[in-house]
Amino acid sequence: MSELVEKILSGRFTRTALLTMRENAIARLKKNPKDERALEVKEVIDTTQVPKLMKEYVFMGFMPGADIDRAIDDKWYSEGVCTFDFYEDSNQTEDFYRILPGDIVITKKMLIASGEMEIYAFGYVTECVDSPNSNKRWLKVDWKHPKEFMRVPLMGCTRTVNPKSLEMVEEKMPPEFWDWLR
């Protein structure tokens, strides 16, 4: 195990540094798919939980086109995954690729008229997977299902992928939200 990998595993790097290292490893693998060091760095970052204070809360829409008949949350829950297929939006794609193991994904539906959203389930990202077949990323998620959904402030979560820092979530969410996450 290299010194770099040991530092990654010990939590010595910031979230930004981890994402930069991951991007660099991917760039090296494009040039040389057998680069063992790049493979090892990418694998460790894709499977190692970020430190608690670096976690992000990702409020994730699950109804393509806001159409309830196209909802995919049940598939996510049963398969232990989270996917994203709106690659035409480069900002959301970038946000989806910033998700790391240890982050919390929360399924949500916007209620624009009230300035709220309904949240249904949450899960801890356990691994990030870049599919060589589809050239798309998906997440392995350990989903939890609270007994009831909850209405919370919208917090600007108007897109499919809405990452929020711990500080923002602490500032905006009611105390009941933290009970719901248990």
Predicted ranges, named:
Residues 65, 113, 131:
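Surface-exposed, flexible loop/turn segments at secondary-structure boundaries
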Residues 9-19, 26-39:
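Charged, low-complexity interaction regions
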Residues 18, 25, 45, 105, ...:
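Hydrophobic beta-strand residues in large extracellular and virion-surface proteins
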Residues 31, 51, 108-111, 125-128:
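Amphipathic alpha-helical interaction surfaces
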Residues 2-6, 31, 37-99, 171, ...:
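Compositionally biased, charged N-terminal/linker segments
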Residues 94-112:
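Short coil-to-beta transition motif at edge beta-strands of beta-rich domains
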Residues 116-182:
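Aromatic- and Lys/Arg-enriched surface recognition patch
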